[in-house]
Structures are given as structure tokens and as C-alpha cells.
């Protein structure tokens, strides 16, 4: 099997991140979204923080972890993770969730896994949700793989 056929939809590898970060940083639409989401921090500081991330986990810890815990504190009664059925924290596992909130649910699971010293999740996300090129890049930095919803039979 030629795995390169999945290059356009798989999560980025860590060695690809510097180039992707530079592409995101140079994108005016991403700049606008980032400064809108984090208005009290100059964009150049956000860019510097991105450039310091060497792995996808570094990125998740630097940008996603704190934001997700703030959302949880402000909008939930709390988060818990019973991982007693997981015998080996160093192995990969498959988690199955409903389609209630594909991004937030997996984000909450990831921060709980980080707190247990475990690896974060990869998620499938439909390309119908990726309305701008910078969003497609950002979700792949955040360990998502893209489900292409409008493929022809020949492309499948």
C-alpha cells in the first residue's frame, strides 16, 4: 500500500510543522482569526509561541490545553476520566464517541489524557467543516485526519 496517497488528509508529522506554522503565520485570514480568538496577545507573540512548538503535543499543550480547561471550568460541572480499564498508558487505544460535538468532546478527552501522561487523540473531521485553507492546516496540526465527503466512486 502506498501511504503517500493519504498525504492530503492525514495529520501532519512533527517534522512538517515548521513549514506549516510559517504558512499559517503568513496567512492574513489566520492572523485575523488568531487575533480575534486571543485579542490581548500580539500576533507576533502567538507566532513566536507557534514556532517554539516542535511536536503536535507541544502545540496542543501550548495552545489548546489551557483554553479547553477554561471552557470546561466556565461551562461544565467538571471533567473526569476513569482510565482504570486501560492497562498500559504507553499504548494506543481506540475511543468511540457519539457525534454530539466532534471537536470539543475529543479536546476534553485529550486534556484529560495529557493529565494522565497519555498521548492525545486523533480525530476524523469532515471536509465540509473546513471552510478555509488555514482551518484545514490547523486541524491537521491538531492531529485530525480529514474525511473527504464528496468523493466520486472513482476517487474512493
Where are these regions (language model features)?
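Membrane-anchoring hydrophobic helices of lipid-metabolizing enzymes
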Residues: 1-93, 99-110, 136, 140-144
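Long, hydrophobic, well-ordered secondary-structure blocks that form the structural core
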Residues: 96-156
Amino acid at each position: 500500500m502506498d501511504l503517500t496517497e493519504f498525504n492530503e488528509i492525514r495529520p501532519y508529522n512533527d517534522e512538517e510543522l515548521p513549514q506549516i506554522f510559517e504558512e499559517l503565520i503568513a496567512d492574513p485570514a489566520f492572523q485575523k482569526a488568531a487575533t480575534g480568538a486571543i485579542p490581548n496577545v500580539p500576533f507576533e507573540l502567538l507566532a513566536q509561541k507557534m514556532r517554539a512548538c516542535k511536536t503536535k503535543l507541544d502545540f496542543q499543550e501550548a495552545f489548546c490545553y489551557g483554553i479547553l480547561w477554561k471552557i470546561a471550568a466556565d461551562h461544565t460541572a467538571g471533567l473526569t476520566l476513569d482510565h482504570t480499564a486501560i492497562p498500559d498508558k504507553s499504548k494506543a487505544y481506540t475511543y468511540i464517541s457519539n457525534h454530539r460535538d466532534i471537536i470539543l468532546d475529543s479536546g476534553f478527552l485529550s486534556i484529560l489524557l495529557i493529565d494522565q501522561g497519555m498521548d492525545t487523540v486523533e480525530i476524523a473531521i469532515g471536509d465540509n467543516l473546513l471552510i478555509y485553507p488555514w482551518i484545514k492546516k490547523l486541524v491537521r496540526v491538531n492531529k485530525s485526519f480529514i474525511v473527504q465527503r464528496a468523493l466520486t466512486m472513482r476517487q474512493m
